[in-house]
Amino acid sequence: MADEMSEPRRVGFVGAGRMAEAIAQGLIRAGKVEAKQVLASAPTDKNLCHFRALGCQTTHSNHEVLQNCPLVIFATKPQVLPAVLAEVAPVVTTEHIIVSVAAGISLSSMEELLPPKTRVLRVSPNLPCVVQEGAMVMTRGHHAGNEDAKLLQNLLEACGQCIEVPESYVDIHTGLSGSGVAFVCTFSEALAEGAIKMGMPSDLAHRIAAQTLLGTAKMLQQEGKHPAQLRTDVLTPAGTTIHGLHALEQGGFRAAAMSAVEAATCRAKELSKK
């Protein structure tokens, strides 16, 4: 099965929302799988139309997806995933690789709902997967092997960065990167509004703020510098940047950002226990 799965002929999606569409789009654009070899299911046509627009096959039957695809990504809402797994369990075999992108549902919970020795993996994505710049982590269950993990990682790198981690890191990733998208957007908005206050037109301010975040992120990735080092590179004695940083420190910016990640992580852990 390992040779067959090295390049899966068919990839299935149970659930066809925005994240499922983003992952499918990334796989197709990167040439990881042909559009006609993607099969997605959902209860209604509301989201399936987006998959059809990509050239994918669609169905209202979850069983049909499992019966036709060796690798199936479950992208349902977390509250319905247990019921969906219980529904498809009769058609799941040890030949399947089952992947969940639903938040708050542990590997052990999924394994309990599926047949013995089912190969299960869990992925925590974030919204930039929509533009193939996601920051994802993945973790595997008891019966998923190295080849399964490598296969999934290779596929998902079409949607951004995908790193294998212990499951205990998944909730932290939710606080850092899943919720972090909103934190970064809030910072970008605040930067732009500062410029607007000083007289810059709104559209221009927001464009420049977004590009500043993008350029800074690329420098951090490509140069491999610690953020503190890059920040220091911008500083000049008695210059504009140190005055601005002083204002951020007076406002408790650093502590607020740390507390935001902590609060979001704690909430993710609470939801995982329910």
From Swiss-Prot:
The keyword Ribonucleoprotein does not apply. Pathway: Amino-acid biosynthesis; L-proline biosynthesis; L-proline from L-glutamate 5-semialdehyde: step 1/1. The keyword Oxidoreductase applies. Signal peptide: none annotated. It catalyses: L-proline + NADP(+) = (S)-1-pyrroline-5-carboxylate + NADPH + 2 H(+); L-proline + NAD(+) = (S)-1-pyrroline-5-carboxylate + NADH + 2 H(+). It is found in: Cytoplasm. Keywords: Acetylation, Amino-acid biosynthesis, Cytoplasm, NADP, Oxidoreductase, Proline biosynthesis. One of its GO terms (cellular component) is cytosol. This is Pyrroline-5-carboxylate reductase 3.
